[in-house]
Regions:
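Conserved strand-to-helix beginnings and helix N-cap segments that scaffold or border functional pockets
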Residues: 28-29, 145-146, 172-173
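Short beta->alpha junction loops
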Residues: 162-169
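Extended, non-catalytic structural segments that build the interaction scaffolds
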Residues: 134-140
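Short, glycine-/Ser/Thr-/acidic-enriched flexible segments
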Residues: 49, 107, 140-142, 166
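Short helix-loop-beta junction
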Residues: 144-162
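Conserved thiamine diphosphate
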Residues: 6-134, 159
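Glycine-rich, anion-gripping cofactor-binding loops and their flanking helix/strand elements
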Residues: 169-177
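Alpha-helix N-cap/loop-to-helix initiation residues
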Residues: 24, 86, 141-142, 168
Length: 177
């Protein structure tokens, strides 16, 4: 993180990656002091969220990464759902000055969107209409949200599914709606 901040300070656009707990929890003070406080242009990527890193053990499973990053001022937080969204969001991250944290799975994920789809950071994506309940998900949990909506539909419950791929700034309008 310190090297990424240094690269940003001389005009580069660094993308730094590690397992979620290492790029967030272990580097939190560096992220705050060297990146956010200095108002630099650093892009952080944390992989293997939650139990997706189970083979590596508890030290590699970030459950608090999003909470840690939400507490960093001026930090934009995204969690793309599939490769089409990843491409769109990565392009925006590169083109937009500021601190970013992206949470990613390392393994394959479902395909939700068509190749070439564009997304706006900060704007949720409705995936399914429903009037009884709303399920909000991001990243790899989106597949589970869609499955849950299918199960609920068999029970006569119409579930709206929203892909909230931007955690910060969160799309308050989509939540209220």
């Amino acid at each position: 993180v310190g090297v990424a901040a240094g690269l940003s300070a001389v005009g580069k656009i660094p993308f730094a990656h590690s397992f979620g707990p290492f790029i967030t929890r272990r580097a939190c003070d560096q992220i705050f002091m060297s990146g956010a406080y200095a108002k630099l242009n650093v892009k952080l990527i944390g992989s293997d969220p939650g139990i997706t890193a189970q083979i590596n053990g508890g030290t590699h499973m970030p459950f608090e990464d999003m909470g840690i990053m939400r507490g960093i001022p001026e930090m934009t937080i995204v969690e793309p759902t599939d490769i089409a969204m990843l491409k769109s969001v990565m392009k925006q991250m590169k083109e937009t000055y500021g601190m970013y944290y992206m949470r990613l799975v390392r393994k394959s994920c479902i395909k939700v969107f068509e190749d070439g789809s564009e997304f706006q950071i900060g704007k949720a994506v409705p995936l399914r209409d429903g009037t009884d309940v709303t399920i909000i998900a991001s990243g790899y949990c989106t597949a589970e949200a869609i499955k849950a909506a299918d199960i609920l539909e068999k029970e006569g419950i119409q579930a709206k599914v929203i892909n909230m791929f931007t955690w910060k700034p969160i799309d308050e309008e989509a939540i209220i709606e």
